[in-house]
Protein backbone atom coordinates (compact mmCIF):
# COMPACT_ATOMS: atom_id res chain seq x y z
CA UNK A 1 0.00 0.00 0.00
CA UNK A 2 1.45 3.34 -1.00
CA UNK A 3 1.71 5.88 1.78
CA UNK A 4 -0.14 8.68 0.04
CA UNK A 5 -3.07 10.44 1.60
CA UNK A 6 -4.84 10.55 -1.72
CA UNK A 7 -3.37 8.70 -4.63
CA UNK A 8 -4.66 10.07 -7.90
CA UNK A 9 -7.31 12.35 -9.36
CA UNK A 10 -9.37 11.20 -12.30
CA UNK A 11 -11.23 13.74 -14.42
CA UNK A 12 -14.09 12.39 -16.48
CA UNK A 13 -16.15 14.49 -18.85
CA UNK A 14 -19.69 13.21 -18.95
CA UNK A 15 -22.42 14.29 -21.27
CA UNK A 16 -25.57 15.10 -19.40
CA UNK A 17 -27.56 15.46 -22.57
CA UNK A 18 -30.70 17.49 -22.19
CA UNK A 19 -29.59 18.87 -18.83
CA UNK A 20 -26.51 20.52 -20.31
CA UNK A 21 -28.21 21.60 -23.48
CA UNK A 22 -30.79 23.41 -21.45
CA UNK A 23 -28.05 24.81 -19.18
CA UNK A 24 -29.96 23.56 -16.16
CA UNK A 25 -28.39 22.87 -12.79
CA UNK A 26 -27.88 19.22 -11.96
CA UNK A 27 -29.98 18.17 -8.99
CA UNK A 28 -28.65 16.15 -6.10
CA UNK A 29 -30.51 13.06 -7.33
CA UNK A 30 -29.16 13.44 -10.86
CA UNK A 31 -25.65 13.80 -9.48
CA UNK A 32 -26.21 10.70 -7.34
CA UNK A 33 -27.22 8.69 -10.41
CA UNK A 34 -23.96 9.73 -12.06
CA UNK A 35 -22.07 8.52 -8.98
CA UNK A 36 -23.66 5.08 -8.74
CA UNK A 37 -23.27 4.52 -12.48
CA UNK A 38 -19.53 4.53 -11.88
CA UNK A 39 -19.55 2.03 -9.00
CA UNK A 40 -19.05 -1.67 -9.67
CA UNK A 41 -22.41 -3.39 -9.28
CA UNK A 42 -20.80 -6.20 -7.25
CA UNK A 43 -19.80 -3.74 -4.51
CA UNK A 44 -22.69 -1.29 -4.68
CA UNK A 45 -24.86 -3.07 -2.12
CA UNK A 46 -22.20 -2.92 0.60
CA UNK A 47 -21.22 0.68 -0.19
CA UNK A 48 -22.45 3.65 1.82
CA UNK A 49 -22.61 7.09 0.21
CA UNK A 50 -22.80 10.58 1.72
CA UNK A 51 -23.55 13.81 -0.16
CA UNK A 52 -23.15 17.48 0.73
CA UNK A 53 -26.37 19.19 1.77
CA UNK A 54 -25.71 22.05 -0.64
CA UNK A 55 -23.64 22.67 -3.76
CA UNK A 56 -20.07 23.50 -2.76
CA UNK A 57 -18.79 26.86 -4.08
CA UNK A 58 -15.81 26.78 -6.42
CA UNK A 59 -12.43 26.04 -4.80
CA UNK A 60 -13.90 24.97 -1.45
CA UNK A 61 -11.25 23.52 0.88
CA UNK A 62 -12.26 20.06 2.15
CA UNK A 63 -10.35 18.98 5.24
CA UNK A 64 -9.44 15.30 5.61
CA UNK A 65 -7.81 14.88 9.00
CA UNK A 66 -4.50 16.75 8.86
CA UNK A 67 -4.68 17.03 5.06
CA UNK A 68 -6.99 18.83 2.67
CA UNK A 69 -8.20 18.78 -0.91
CA UNK A 70 -9.92 21.48 -2.95
CA UNK A 71 -13.09 21.31 -4.99
CA UNK A 72 -12.97 22.31 -8.70
CA UNK A 73 -13.11 25.92 -9.85
CA UNK A 74 -16.86 25.62 -10.34
CA UNK A 75 -19.79 24.69 -8.12
CA UNK A 76 -20.12 20.98 -7.38
CA UNK A 77 -21.91 18.35 -5.35
CA UNK A 78 -19.54 16.49 -3.04
CA UNK A 79 -20.05 12.74 -2.56
CA UNK A 80 -18.13 10.58 -0.11
CA UNK A 81 -18.07 6.87 -1.00
CA UNK A 82 -17.19 4.27 1.63
CA UNK A 83 -16.93 0.79 0.12
CA UNK A 84 -15.78 -0.88 3.33
CA UNK A 85 -18.17 0.13 6.13
CA UNK A 86 -16.99 -2.68 8.42
CA UNK A 87 -13.36 -1.53 8.31
CA UNK A 88 -11.95 1.00 10.73
CA UNK A 89 -10.58 4.25 9.38
CA UNK A 90 -8.43 4.78 7.57
CA UNK A 91 -9.03 2.65 4.52
CA UNK A 92 -9.52 3.14 0.80
CA UNK A 93 -12.39 5.51 -0.06
CA UNK A 94 -13.40 7.98 -2.79
CA UNK A 95 -14.50 11.58 -2.99
CA UNK A 96 -16.55 12.41 -6.09
CA UNK A 97 -17.23 16.02 -7.04
CA UNK A 98 -19.98 16.45 -9.65
CA UNK A 99 -20.09 19.79 -11.46
CA UNK A 100 -23.48 21.33 -10.75
CA UNK A 101 -23.75 22.84 -14.25
CA UNK A 102 -21.24 21.14 -16.54
CA UNK A 103 -21.57 17.52 -15.35
CA UNK A 104 -17.81 17.15 -14.97
CA UNK A 105 -16.71 14.48 -12.47
CA UNK A 106 -13.60 14.62 -10.30
CA UNK A 107 -12.72 11.42 -8.42
CA UNK A 108 -10.22 11.72 -5.59
CA UNK A 109 -8.93 8.56 -3.90
CA UNK A 110 -8.14 8.87 -0.21
CA UNK A 111 -7.96 6.78 2.96
CA UNK A 112 -9.87 8.90 5.47
CA UNK A 113 -13.28 10.45 6.03
CA UNK A 114 -13.92 14.22 5.67
CA UNK A 115 -13.53 16.27 8.84
CA UNK A 116 -14.69 19.61 7.39
CA UNK A 117 -17.34 19.48 6.17
CA UNK A 118 -17.82 16.48 8.43
CA UNK A 119 -20.07 13.50 7.79
CA UNK A 120 -22.52 15.09 10.24
CA UNK A 121 -22.74 18.04 7.83
CA UNK A 122 -23.66 15.70 4.97
CA UNK A 123 -26.65 13.50 4.15
CA UNK A 124 -26.31 9.72 3.97
CA UNK A 125 -27.96 9.16 0.62
CA UNK A 126 -27.28 5.41 0.55
CA UNK A 127 -26.74 2.98 3.40
CA UNK A 128 -24.86 -0.29 3.20
CA UNK A 129 -26.95 -3.44 3.11
CA UNK A 130 -24.51 -4.95 5.61
CA UNK A 131 -26.67 -5.01 8.71
CA UNK A 132 -25.96 -5.81 12.32
CA UNK A 133 -27.23 -4.90 15.73
CA UNK A 134 -25.11 -1.86 16.57
CA UNK A 135 -26.70 -1.38 19.97
CA UNK A 136 -25.74 -4.70 21.54
CA UNK A 137 -24.84 -4.21 25.20
CA UNK A 138 -22.23 -6.63 26.44
CA UNK A 139 -23.76 -8.25 29.49
CA UNK A 140 -21.60 -8.65 32.58
CA UNK A 141 -19.79 -11.98 32.66
CA UNK A 142 -20.15 -14.29 35.60
CA UNK A 143 -17.10 -13.92 37.82
CA UNK A 144 -15.13 -17.17 37.37
CA UNK A 145 -12.92 -18.90 39.86
CA UNK A 146 -9.38 -17.74 39.09
CA UNK A 147 -7.29 -20.56 37.68
CA UNK A 148 -3.90 -18.99 38.10
CA UNK A 149 -1.82 -18.53 41.21
CA UNK A 150 -1.26 -14.79 41.27
CA UNK A 151 2.32 -13.77 40.57
CA UNK A 152 1.59 -10.31 41.97
CA UNK A 153 -0.99 -8.79 44.24
CA UNK A 154 -3.89 -6.95 42.65
CA UNK A 155 -2.48 -3.65 43.90
CA UNK A 156 0.42 -4.06 41.48
CA UNK A 157 -1.72 -4.22 38.34
CA UNK A 158 -2.83 -1.14 36.38
CA UNK A 159 -4.59 -0.61 33.06
CA UNK A 160 -5.45 2.18 30.62
CA UNK A 161 -8.23 1.69 28.05
CA UNK A 162 -8.43 4.23 25.20
CA UNK A 163 -11.05 4.59 22.47
CA UNK A 164 -10.97 7.94 20.65
CA UNK A 165 -13.98 7.47 18.39
CA UNK A 166 -13.20 10.41 16.10
CA UNK A 167 -16.65 11.99 16.00
CA UNK A 168 -20.28 10.85 16.43
CA UNK A 169 -20.61 9.81 12.78
CA UNK A 170 -17.77 7.28 12.91
CA UNK A 171 -17.76 6.32 16.60
CA UNK A 172 -19.25 2.88 16.05
CA UNK A 173 -20.78 1.03 19.02
CA UNK A 174 -18.38 -1.87 18.49
CA UNK A 175 -15.64 0.25 20.06
CA UNK A 176 -17.67 0.46 23.25
CA UNK A 177 -18.19 -3.32 23.05
CA UNK A 178 -14.44 -3.90 22.64
CA UNK A 179 -13.70 -1.73 25.67
CA UNK A 180 -16.47 -3.23 27.76
CA UNK A 181 -15.22 -6.73 27.03
CA UNK A 182 -11.60 -6.06 27.99
CA UNK A 183 -12.69 -4.03 31.03
CA UNK A 184 -14.75 -6.93 32.35
CA UNK A 185 -11.90 -9.32 31.59
CA UNK A 186 -9.49 -7.30 33.71
CA UNK A 187 -11.99 -6.86 36.50
CA UNK A 188 -13.60 -10.29 36.77
CA UNK A 189 -11.07 -12.73 35.30
CA UNK A 190 -7.81 -11.14 36.45
CA UNK A 191 -8.98 -9.34 39.57
CA UNK A 192 -7.77 -5.87 38.66
CA UNK A 193 -8.83 -3.13 41.03
CA UNK A 194 -11.32 -0.84 39.25
CA UNK A 195 -9.54 2.10 40.87
CA UNK A 196 -6.44 1.07 38.90
CA UNK A 197 -8.21 1.01 35.52
CA UNK A 198 -8.38 4.35 33.68
CA UNK A 199 -10.98 4.46 30.90
CA UNK A 200 -10.60 7.23 28.30
CA UNK A 201 -13.37 7.18 25.68
CA UNK A 202 -14.83 9.57 23.09
CA UNK A 203 -16.39 12.60 24.84
CA UNK A 204 -15.91 11.19 28.33
CA UNK A 205 -18.73 11.70 30.81
CA UNK A 206 -20.73 14.05 28.58
CA UNK A 207 -24.34 13.08 27.92
CA UNK A 208 -24.20 14.46 24.38
CA UNK A 209 -24.71 12.18 21.39
CA UNK A 210 -21.32 10.63 20.64
CA UNK A 211 -22.09 7.44 18.68
CA UNK A 212 -23.16 6.62 15.13
CA UNK A 213 -26.37 5.15 16.54
CA UNK A 214 -27.46 8.63 17.64
CA UNK A 215 -27.08 8.03 21.38
CA UNK A 216 -24.55 8.67 24.13
CA UNK A 217 -22.08 5.97 25.13
CA UNK A 218 -23.15 4.21 28.35
CA UNK A 219 -20.70 5.17 31.07
CA UNK A 220 -21.12 1.83 32.86
CA UNK A 221 -18.99 -0.78 31.10
CA UNK A 222 -19.91 -3.81 33.20
CA UNK A 223 -23.53 -3.23 34.11
CA UNK A 224 -23.02 -2.91 37.86
CA UNK A 225 -24.56 0.55 38.09
CA UNK A 226 -21.26 2.40 38.52
CA UNK A 227 -19.85 4.73 35.87
CA UNK A 228 -16.55 3.46 34.50
CA UNK A 229 -15.69 5.92 31.71
CA UNK A 230 -13.72 8.74 33.30
CA UNK A 231 -12.16 11.04 30.71
CA UNK A 232 -12.67 12.32 27.18
CA UNK A 233 -10.21 10.97 24.62
CA UNK A 234 -7.96 13.99 24.22
CA UNK A 235 -4.18 14.05 24.02
CA UNK A 236 -4.03 16.19 27.16
CA UNK A 237 -6.04 13.65 29.18
CA UNK A 238 -3.91 10.77 27.91
CA UNK A 239 -0.69 12.65 28.64
CA UNK A 240 -1.90 13.45 32.17
CA UNK A 241 -2.89 9.82 32.77
CA UNK A 242 0.52 8.47 31.76
CA UNK A 243 2.29 11.23 33.66
CA UNK A 244 0.42 10.26 36.83
CA UNK A 245 1.31 6.61 36.30
CA UNK A 246 4.95 7.51 35.73
CA UNK A 247 5.06 9.14 39.16
CA UNK A 248 3.13 6.31 40.83
CA UNK A 249 4.26 2.99 39.37
CA UNK A 250 7.43 1.25 40.47
CA UNK A 251 9.50 -1.66 39.18
CA UNK A 252 7.11 -3.98 41.03
CA UNK A 253 4.05 -2.88 39.02
CA UNK A 254 2.47 -4.08 35.77
CA UNK A 255 0.69 -1.87 33.23
CA UNK A 256 -1.73 -3.01 30.51
CA UNK A 257 -2.66 -0.56 27.71
CA UNK A 258 -5.53 -1.21 25.29
CA UNK A 259 -6.41 1.05 22.33
CA UNK A 260 -9.14 0.79 19.71
CA UNK A 261 -11.02 2.82 17.05
CA UNK A 262 -9.49 4.59 14.04
CA UNK A 263 -5.92 5.29 13.01
CA UNK A 264 -4.11 7.34 10.42
CA UNK A 265 -0.61 8.29 9.26
CA UNK A 266 1.03 11.47 8.02
CA UNK A 267 3.07 12.10 4.88
CA UNK A 268 6.16 10.72 6.66
CA UNK A 269 4.41 7.47 7.56
CA UNK A 270 4.09 8.29 11.27
CA UNK A 271 1.09 6.31 12.55
CA UNK A 272 -1.49 7.91 14.79
CA UNK A 273 -4.44 6.99 16.98
CA UNK A 274 -7.60 9.00 16.22
CA UNK A 275 -8.98 10.74 19.31
CA UNK A 276 -12.19 12.67 19.93
CA UNK A 277 -12.95 15.60 17.62
CA UNK A 278 -10.70 13.91 15.04
CA UNK A 279 -7.52 14.75 16.92
CA UNK A 280 -4.49 12.65 15.95
CA UNK A 281 -2.17 11.26 18.62
CA UNK A 282 1.00 10.23 16.80
CA UNK A 283 3.18 7.30 17.82
CA UNK A 284 6.13 9.66 18.16
CA UNK A 285 4.20 11.53 20.86
CA UNK A 286 2.46 8.58 22.51
CA UNK A 287 5.52 6.35 22.97
CA UNK A 288 7.67 8.72 25.09
CA UNK A 289 4.79 9.12 27.56
CA UNK A 290 4.61 5.33 27.95
CA UNK A 291 8.37 4.79 27.97
CA UNK A 292 8.68 7.21 30.89
CA UNK A 293 6.75 4.78 33.11
CA UNK A 294 9.07 2.71 35.29
CA UNK A 295 6.92 -0.41 35.55
CA UNK A 296 8.17 -3.99 35.78
CA UNK A 297 6.51 -4.67 32.43
CA UNK A 298 4.07 -2.96 30.06
CA UNK A 299 1.71 -5.00 27.88
CA UNK A 300 0.21 -3.03 24.94
CA UNK A 301 -2.60 -4.21 22.64
CA UNK A 302 -3.67 -1.94 19.76
CA UNK A 303 -6.59 -2.54 17.41
CA UNK A 304 -6.72 0.63 15.29
CA UNK A 305 -5.68 0.96 11.64
CA UNK A 306 -1.95 1.35 10.96
CA UNK A 307 -1.25 0.31 14.56
CA UNK A 308 1.89 -1.56 13.52
CA UNK A 309 3.54 1.82 13.06
CA UNK A 310 3.74 2.19 16.85
CA UNK A 311 6.03 -0.81 17.30
CA UNK A 312 9.32 0.79 16.28
CA UNK A 313 8.96 3.42 19.01
CA UNK A 314 9.10 0.74 21.72
CA UNK A 315 11.97 -1.40 20.45
CA UNK A 316 14.46 0.27 22.77
CA UNK A 317 12.32 -0.44 25.83
CA UNK A 318 13.00 -3.97 27.16
CA UNK A 319 9.97 -3.68 29.46
CA UNK A 320 7.39 -3.41 26.67
CA UNK A 321 5.46 -6.12 24.83
CA UNK A 322 3.23 -4.81 22.03
CA UNK A 323 0.68 -6.53 19.78
CA UNK A 324 -1.14 -4.75 16.94
CA UNK A 325 -4.03 -5.62 14.65
CA UNK A 326 -2.23 -4.58 11.47
CA UNK A 327 1.00 -3.39 9.94
CA UNK A 328 2.07 0.24 9.76
CA UNK A 329 0.28 0.71 6.43
CA UNK A 330 -2.79 -1.53 6.77
CA UNK A 331 -6.33 -0.81 7.94
CA UNK A 332 -7.96 -3.02 10.55
CA UNK A 333 -11.45 -4.43 10.46
CA UNK A 334 -14.44 -5.41 12.52
CA UNK A 335 -15.87 -8.90 12.64
CA UNK A 336 -18.38 -9.81 9.95
CA UNK A 337 -21.31 -9.11 12.26
CA UNK A 338 -19.90 -5.67 13.08
CA UNK A 339 -20.21 -6.02 16.85
CA UNK A 340 -16.52 -6.27 17.75
CA UNK A 341 -13.19 -5.67 16.07
CA UNK A 342 -11.64 -8.86 14.75
CA UNK A 343 -8.14 -8.88 16.26
CA UNK A 344 -8.95 -7.51 19.71
CA UNK A 345 -11.97 -9.83 19.97
CA UNK A 346 -9.77 -12.90 19.57
CA UNK A 347 -7.02 -11.45 21.75
CA UNK A 348 -9.57 -10.99 24.53
CA UNK A 349 -11.03 -14.45 23.89
CA UNK A 350 -7.56 -15.97 24.27
CA UNK A 351 -7.27 -14.68 27.83
CA UNK A 352 -10.93 -15.09 28.84
CA UNK A 353 -12.56 -18.14 27.27
CA UNK A 354 -12.03 -21.49 28.96
CA UNK A 355 -11.35 -24.63 26.96
CA UNK A 356 -12.67 -28.05 27.98
CA UNK A 357 -9.39 -28.54 29.83
CA UNK A 358 -10.36 -25.76 32.21
CA UNK A 359 -7.53 -23.53 31.01
CA UNK A 360 -7.92 -20.46 28.82
CA UNK A 361 -8.07 -21.26 25.10
CA UNK A 362 -4.92 -19.23 24.50
CA UNK A 363 -2.93 -20.99 27.23
CA UNK A 364 -1.09 -23.41 24.94
CA UNK A 365 1.15 -25.01 27.56
CA UNK A 366 -1.61 -24.98 30.20
CA UNK A 367 0.45 -23.37 32.92
CA UNK A 368 -2.38 -21.00 34.00
CA UNK A 369 -0.57 -18.04 32.41
CA UNK A 370 -1.86 -16.97 28.99
CA UNK A 371 1.17 -14.95 28.02
CA UNK A 372 1.18 -11.90 25.76
CA UNK A 373 2.78 -14.00 23.04
CA UNK A 374 0.24 -16.82 23.41
CA UNK A 375 -2.65 -14.33 23.26
CA UNK A 376 -1.17 -12.65 20.19
CA UNK A 377 -0.60 -15.99 18.46
CA UNK A 378 -4.16 -17.10 19.19
CA UNK A 379 -5.59 -13.83 17.85
CA UNK A 380 -3.34 -13.90 14.78
CA UNK A 381 -4.32 -17.43 13.78
CA UNK A 382 -8.04 -16.76 14.29
CA UNK A 383 -8.05 -13.38 12.52
CA UNK A 384 -9.59 -13.95 9.07
CA UNK A 385 -9.74 -10.34 7.90
CA UNK A 386 -7.42 -8.68 5.41
CA UNK A 387 -4.95 -7.56 8.06
CA UNK A 388 -1.60 -8.85 9.28
CA UNK A 389 -1.26 -8.63 13.09
CA UNK A 390 2.19 -7.71 14.40
CA UNK A 391 4.02 -8.38 17.65
CA UNK A 392 7.26 -7.36 19.32
CA UNK A 393 8.99 -7.72 22.66
CA UNK A 394 12.65 -7.93 23.59
CA UNK A 395 14.43 -10.53 25.70
CA UNK A 396 11.52 -13.00 25.44
CA UNK A 397 9.39 -10.80 27.69
CA UNK A 398 6.10 -11.69 25.99
CA UNK A 399 6.72 -15.42 26.60
CA UNK A 400 6.49 -14.78 30.35
CA UNK A 401 4.26 -11.69 30.72
CA UNK A 402 0.53 -12.26 31.25
CA UNK A 403 -2.42 -10.23 32.53
CA UNK A 404 -2.00 -11.98 35.87
CA UNK A 405 1.62 -10.91 36.12
CA UNK A 406 4.83 -12.66 35.18
CA UNK A 407 4.79 -16.40 34.67
CA UNK A 408 6.12 -17.93 37.90
CA UNK A 409 9.65 -19.27 38.15
CA UNK A 410 10.01 -22.72 39.62
CA UNK A 411 13.60 -22.17 40.70
CA UNK A 412 16.55 -19.85 40.29
CA UNK A 413 20.08 -19.29 41.47
CA UNK A 414 22.71 -22.00 41.91
CA UNK A 415 21.54 -25.60 41.76
CA UNK A 416 23.51 -28.67 42.87
CA UNK A 417 22.74 -31.59 40.57
CA UNK A 418 23.46 -35.22 41.47
CA UNK A 419 23.95 -37.95 38.89
CA UNK A 420 20.69 -38.80 37.16
CA UNK A 421 18.77 -35.95 38.79
CA UNK A 422 16.34 -33.90 36.70
CA UNK A 423 14.55 -30.64 37.37
CA UNK A 424 12.18 -28.23 35.67
CA UNK A 425 13.04 -24.58 35.21
CA UNK A 426 10.97 -21.68 33.92
CA UNK A 427 12.48 -18.22 33.92
CA UNK A 428 14.57 -15.61 32.17
CA UNK A 429 17.56 -15.27 34.48
CA UNK A 430 20.90 -17.00 34.13
CA UNK A 431 21.19 -20.10 36.32
CA UNK A 432 24.27 -22.01 37.46
CA UNK A 433 24.49 -25.77 37.80
CA UNK A 434 27.11 -27.37 40.04
CA UNK A 435 27.92 -30.99 39.12
CA UNK A 436 30.80 -33.38 39.79
CA UNK A 437 33.59 -33.27 37.22
CA UNK A 438 33.32 -35.68 34.28
CA UNK A 439 29.61 -36.20 34.95
CA UNK A 440 27.27 -36.40 31.92
CA UNK A 441 24.57 -33.72 31.59
CA UNK A 442 21.47 -34.51 29.56
CA UNK A 443 19.36 -31.46 28.67
CA UNK A 444 15.80 -31.99 27.46
CA UNK A 445 13.80 -28.97 26.31
CA UNK A 446 10.07 -29.64 25.99
CA UNK A 447 8.62 -26.13 25.84
CA UNK A 448 8.96 -23.67 24.30
CA UNK A 449 10.90 -24.82 21.26
CA UNK A 450 11.14 -21.48 19.47
CA UNK A 451 13.52 -19.72 21.87
CA UNK A 452 17.27 -19.27 21.61
CA UNK A 453 19.18 -20.92 24.47
CA UNK A 454 22.80 -20.19 25.36
CA UNK A 455 24.99 -22.64 27.27
CA UNK A 456 28.38 -22.06 28.87
CA UNK A 457 30.38 -24.77 30.64
CA UNK A 458 33.31 -24.10 32.95
CA UNK A 459 35.06 -25.86 35.84
CA UNK A 460 35.81 -24.51 39.29
CA UNK A 461 35.37 -25.00 43.00
CA UNK A 462 32.11 -24.09 44.77
CA UNK A 463 32.36 -20.68 46.41
Give the positions of each predicted feature:
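A short, surface-exposed interaction/processing loop segment used at functional sites
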Residues: 94-140
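Active-site-proximal C-terminal subdomain of hydrolase catalytic domains
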Residues: 180, 298-393
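Acidic, glycine-anchored loop motifs typical of Ca2+
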Residues: 175, 211-229, 271, 360-372, ...
Amino acid sequence: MKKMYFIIIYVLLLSIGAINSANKSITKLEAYNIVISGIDSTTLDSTEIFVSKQILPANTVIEIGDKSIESPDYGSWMFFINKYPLSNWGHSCNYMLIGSNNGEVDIIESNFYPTKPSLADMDKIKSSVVTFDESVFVKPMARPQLLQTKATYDSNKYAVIISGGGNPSVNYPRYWNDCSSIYQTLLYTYNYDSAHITVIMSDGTSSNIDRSTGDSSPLDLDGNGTNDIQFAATSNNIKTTFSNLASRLTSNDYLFIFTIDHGNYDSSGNSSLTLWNDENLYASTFAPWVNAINAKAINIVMGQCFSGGFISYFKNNPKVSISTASTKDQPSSSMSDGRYDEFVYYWTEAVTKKASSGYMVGDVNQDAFTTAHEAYDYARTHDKKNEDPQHYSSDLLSHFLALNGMRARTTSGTIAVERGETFNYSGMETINWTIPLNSPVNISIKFPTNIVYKWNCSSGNPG
